[in-house]
Amino acid sequence: MAAINRDDVAHLARLAHIEMSAQELDRMAGELAVIVDSVKSVSEAAGDDVPATSHPIPLTNVFREDVVGHTFSAEQALSGAPDSDDNRFKVPAILDEA
């Protein structure tokens, strides 16, 4: 990976329409060089034998059997509803679709 120099930073600043002083260009070039070196060292650390992961700790789902327990009848569920229609909760329309 090529090093980031002052000219690269000046070019990026022009593309982003950011005005930078000579001192800022020098400081940013140094900071970006450190970042590039850090990314390079991380890239070298992960070999081909290391599988790609999305999370550092293995995640497993805990499944349980889906057992139907005590349920309400439609009438019981709708007993406290302000409005219902055909055994369904009736709510005000929020979209202008029929």
UniProtKB/Swiss-Prot annotation:
Keywords: ATP-binding, Ligase, Nucleotide-binding, Protein biosynthesis. InterPro entries: Asp/Glu-ADT_sf_sub_c (IPR036113), GatC (IPR003837). It holds the Pfam family GatC. It is an enzyme of class 6 (ligase). GO terms for molecular function: asparaginyl-tRNA synthase (glutamine-hydrolyzing) activity; ATP binding; glutaminyl-tRNA synthase (glutamine-hydrolyzing) activity. Signal peptide: none annotated. One of its GO terms (biological process) is translation. The keyword rRNA-binding does not apply. It catalyses: L-glutamyl-tRNA(Gln) + L-glutamine + ATP + H2O = L-glutaminyl-tRNA(Gln) + L-glutamate + ADP + phosphate + H(+); L-aspartyl-tRNA(Asn) + L-glutamine + ATP + H2O = L-asparaginyl-tRNA(Asn) + L-glutamate + ADP + phosphate + 2 H(+). Residues 75-98 are annotated as: Disordered. Its EC number is 6.3.5.-. Belongs to the GatC family. Heterotrimer of A, B and C subunits. Allows the formation of correctly charged Asn-tRNA(Asn) or Gln-tRNA(Gln) through the transamidation of misacylated Asp-tRNA(Asn) or Glu-tRNA(Gln) in organisms which lack either or both of asparaginyl-tRNA or glutaminyl-tRNA synthetases. The reaction takes place in the presence of glutamine and ATP through an activated phospho-Asp-tRNA(Asn) or phospho-Glu-tRNA(Gln). This is Aspartyl/glutamyl-tRNA(Asn/Gln) amidotransferase subunit C. It comes from Pseudarthrobacter chlorophenolicus (strain ATCC 700700 / DSM 12829 / CIP 107037 / JCM 12360 / KCTC 9906 / NCIMB 13794 / A6).
